[in-house]
């Protein structure tokens, strides 16, 4: 079958032929319809320090997808051939304390689809049936293909009560923008997003944020005054991984504020811990999605009217994958979707 693979320990990604994956007793086989390019895939393409330490070569990459079930293992219940599914990209062990306690997103033995095992940039994908999620009929293939990153956004945004709260989102990448849109949809008052990339700030404006602030040109304190905010933000979502952005967020938080962190800093990061201590801030680390509460909330948010379509800015066939990666690497894109149909 055709697959996009990391074939060499250098920059790039290559289309190749690989054997069709084998189906286990508890697995389902998915014929891929659409895949989306993740920031992780860009890291793998660039062959940065993280990728060199993490990715075995060769490896079929990709973990954002939607497809159709075409085969089912003999022990599988709850799925039938023809079901339209996406799936949780974190494969968990099932026997550690967190798995057995129902906190599977905190499994210490997690492996990643398209990272540690063959991924979804292929004609067919095999995953444990436990990881599959049926897509409701009224949700499009395109939106379903970005459920993985949308789940990061939902998990981060819904970590705290948002109704009537003022929210600061640092980092206007696709996940940050989707998180901001979730906050507005569920009842936050002011949702302010910061970045230095004007293209993505414009995208955030299209998604309905209260203010999209280019911090290289505009002072956040002035924006807060403009909005009539006198005490700081109640909730902070750190989506950038940029130390200066996190420090700005800490400065802008109200006393007793709550912060969810999804962005991954490139190296050790120093902050003024006095801000955390004397403001009584609560900081929560976010990894992946809650299985499967986040997934049900994703579907419900879209069904209740949350419009994510503006976040998908580029569409290509799988044979145009290089154009897709070029768009993602340029920083002048939202989500990029590749069609296998």
Swiss-Prot record:
Zn(2+) 1 binds at residues 38, 63-64. Binds 2 Zn(2+) ions per subunit. It catalyses: L-threonine + NAD(+) = (2S)-2-amino-3-oxobutanoate + NADH + H(+). The record marks 148 as: Important for catalytic activity for the proton relay mechanism but does not participate directly in the coordination of zinc atom. Its cofactor is Zn(2+). It is found in: Cytoplasm. Gene3D superfamilies: Medium-chain alcohol dehydrogenases, catalytic domain, NAD(P)-binding Rossmann-like Domain. Pathway: Amino-acid degradation; L-threonine degradation via oxydo-reductase pathway; glycine from L-threonine: step 1/2. Its main location: cytoplasm. It comes from the Bacteria. One of its GO terms (biological process) is L-threonine catabolic process to glycine. Keywords: Cytoplasm, Metal-binding, NAD, Oxidoreductase, Zinc. Homotetramer. This is L-threonine 3-dehydrogenase. It comes from Serratia proteamaculans (strain 568). The lineage of its organism: Bacteria, Pseudomonadati, Pseudomonadota, Gammaproteobacteria, Enterobacterales. The gene is tdh.
């Amino acid at each position: 079958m055709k697959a996009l693979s990391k074939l060499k320990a250098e920059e790039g990604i290559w289309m190749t032929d690989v054997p069709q994956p084998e189906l286990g007793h508890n697995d389902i086989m998915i014929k891929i319809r659409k895949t989306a390019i993740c920031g992780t895939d860009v890291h793998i393409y660039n062959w940065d320090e993280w990728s060199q330490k993490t990715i075995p070569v060769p490896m079929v990459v990709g973990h954002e997808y939607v497809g159709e079930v075409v085969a089912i293992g003999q022990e599988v219940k709850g799925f039938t051939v023809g079901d339209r599914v996406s799936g949780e990209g974190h494969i968990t062990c099932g026997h550690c304390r967190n798995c057995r306690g129902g906190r599977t997103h905190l499994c210490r033995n997690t492996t990643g689809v398209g990272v540690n095992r063959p991924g979804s940039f292929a004609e067919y994908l095999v995953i444990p049936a436990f990881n599959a999620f049926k897509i409701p009929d009224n949700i499009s293939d395109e939106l379903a293909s970005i459920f993985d990153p949308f789940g990061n956004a939902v998990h981060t945004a819904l970590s705290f009560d948002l109704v009537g709260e003022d929210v600061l989102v640092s980092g206007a990448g696709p996940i940050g923008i989707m998180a901001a849109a979730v906050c507005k949809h569920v009842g936050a008052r002011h949702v302010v997003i910061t970045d230095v990339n004007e293209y993505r700030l414009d995208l955030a404006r299209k998604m309905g944020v209260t203010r999209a602030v280019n911090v290289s040109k505009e002072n956040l304190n002035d924006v807060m005054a403009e909005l009539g905010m006198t005490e700081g933000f109640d909730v902070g979502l750190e989506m950038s991984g940029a130390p200066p952005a996190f420090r700005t967020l800490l400065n802008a938080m109200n006393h007793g504020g709550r912060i969810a962190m999804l962005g991954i800093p490139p190296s050790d990061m120093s902050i003024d811990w006095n801000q955390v201590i004397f403001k009584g801030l609560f900081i929560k680390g976010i990894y992946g999605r809650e299985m499967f509460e986040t997934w049900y909330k994703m579907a419900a948010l879209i069904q209740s009217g949350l419009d994510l379509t503006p976040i998908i800015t580029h569409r290509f066939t799988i044979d145009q994958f290089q154009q897709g990666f070029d768009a993602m690497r340029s920083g002048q894109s939202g989500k990029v979707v590749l069609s296998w149909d």
